[in-house]
Amino acid sequence: MKELKKHYQRAFLALIKAYKRYYLGVWIIKLPFYKLTSNQHKITKWQAKRDERLEFLHNALKTFKFLRTFDEESKKWLNSPEFKAKYLDTKHPYPPLLNPDSVDYKCIPAELAWEINLPLPPNYDFIYFVVWGCASRSTLTYFSQEGLRLSPFCSDLPTIEQYKLTFDFLKNSTIKIKKILLIHSYTSNFIGEKYLYLVVKNVPVFIVVRDPISIVKTWANHTHPNPNKINKFNLTFDYHQVLDCIVYDSGKNPNMDNEGVYLASQSCSFAQKKYLPYFTKNPKIIIDASDLSVDNAYRTMQNLGKKLNFTLTLPKKDYVNKSNTSTFHNLFPFILICHSGDLTKMFKGGFEQRNMKSLEYKNSIKIIITDGIRGNAWRRNRDYTQLNGIESQQILFFISQKNAQKLYSDKSLFESTKEYLQGFIKALNKRIALESKNQLAEKDILEYFAKNKAQRQKYKTIFDENLSFYKELCPDIVESWKYYNEFEKMCAELDKSKERQNERI
C-alpha cells in the first residue's frame, strides 16, 4: 500500500518520541525533590504523568509492531475462507484489509483504519439516529445528564474526518461507560455510503419520530442567532429591550413561503431513505416525540433504560424545565452583571438609565441566565450554584460559589437583584406569549398547503419517500399523527376534485 510506508515512518518517530519522554524527560529529576519536600500532591501528579507516558509508550510500541507485520497479516486474511464468504461472495463494496474481529484497534491510526476499510471500533452500546425537529436536543441532554457518552459529530467535517473523530473516540473510551454512536440524518451533508458501511455492530437503533406537519412547523418557526443580541447587561438595562432579539429564519415573523423551510425540512428531518437502509438488520426502538415532553420524559427514560441497559441516576425533578423549542434555541444564555454602583439607576419598568461602566468592573458579580437544556453544564460545575430566592418555570440562574457569598452578604444588592430578575421573568413570559401568538400552528400549515398546490406536492413527495419506513416499523405511531393523516386526506380529496374537473372538460 502506497500510504503504508508513511504510517510506518510516523509510528517509528512516535515511538522514539514516547521513549524519550518516558526515559529521558526532565520530569524524572523532579521526583527526588518532591520526596525531599514531602509534597504529596506533586508526587501524585508525577505518578499520574508517569503512568500516562508509560501507556503512550506501550501504545506507540504496539502500533510500530503492528505496522511491521501488516502485510503478512493482511495477506493471511485476504486469502482466508472467512473473508471470501463474508465479503467477496456478498460483493461487499468496502471489504476490510484486516480481520476486524482479531485486530487490536488501539494499535491502528484512524487515518490508516479508514484506508483499509476497518469498521468503527465496536465499543458502542446502541445507535441514536438523530432526526432534527424530533426532540433531538432534549434527547441528547437526557442521555448526557445520565452519564452516557455521545460520539462527537460536526456537520461541517468531510466524511473521512468524521470517521477519524469517531474512531478515536471509540477506541479510547473505557468499556464501563455506556456509549452512544450518533448518526445525524443530513442529506445536505450526507455522511457517506462508506462511513455507514463501516458501522457494523448489531446493536439497537433508537429513533424518535414525530408528526411530519409538526416537524415542518418547527422549521417554519425556526430562529437563528441575532448578531445584535445583548449577551451581557447590568441592572440598569431595560430587560424588555434585552429580550427583543428573536429573529426567525424567514425574517421578523414565520413564513411558509420562505424556501428555507422546505430545504431545512428536506435536508435535516426527512433523510430516512438515505440512512435507514444501512440498518435493516439492527433491532429498532422507536418512540414518538410526545413521549419526551416534560410530563412524560422521566417515565420514558426509565423504559428506555430497561431496553438499552442503563440506569437513571437523577431524580424526576431534574427532568423538569428541559423542554426545548426552536423559538428560544438562540435566546439563551445571558450574563447579568450585578454591582452596587448601579442601584440608583436600576431599571424598574419605567425609564431606562443605562450605565455601561459596571460591565467592565473586575469586582462585579456575574449571574448566568440560561434555560433548562443548557443548565446541565452549570449544574455539573462544582464552582457554580443556583441562585437562591428566584424561581421560574422557564429559566435557571447560576452564580459562582465565591460570588454567591459576596452577593448574599450585601443585602441591599441581593434584594435589588431579586427584584430586577422578577421583572426579567415577567418580561420573558410576555415575550413568550407574544412570539407564540405570532408563530404558525399545525392548522396554519395545513391551510397553507390547501391553498398552495405546488408546495403541497413538494412536501408530499418527501413525506412519501421517507415515511414508508415508519409505516412499516411503527404503524401505530403513524396512525396517531393527527395532522399528517389530515394532510393525507386533504391531498386525496383535492386530487379527486381535480380529476372530476378534468373529466368535465
What is each stretch, according to the model?
Residues 2-119, 311-505:
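PAPS-dependent sulfotransferases, especially Golgi type II membrane carbohydrate sulfotransferases
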Residues 4-54, 58-64, 69-75, 80, 191-404, 468, ...:
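PAPS-dependent sulfotransferase catalytic domain
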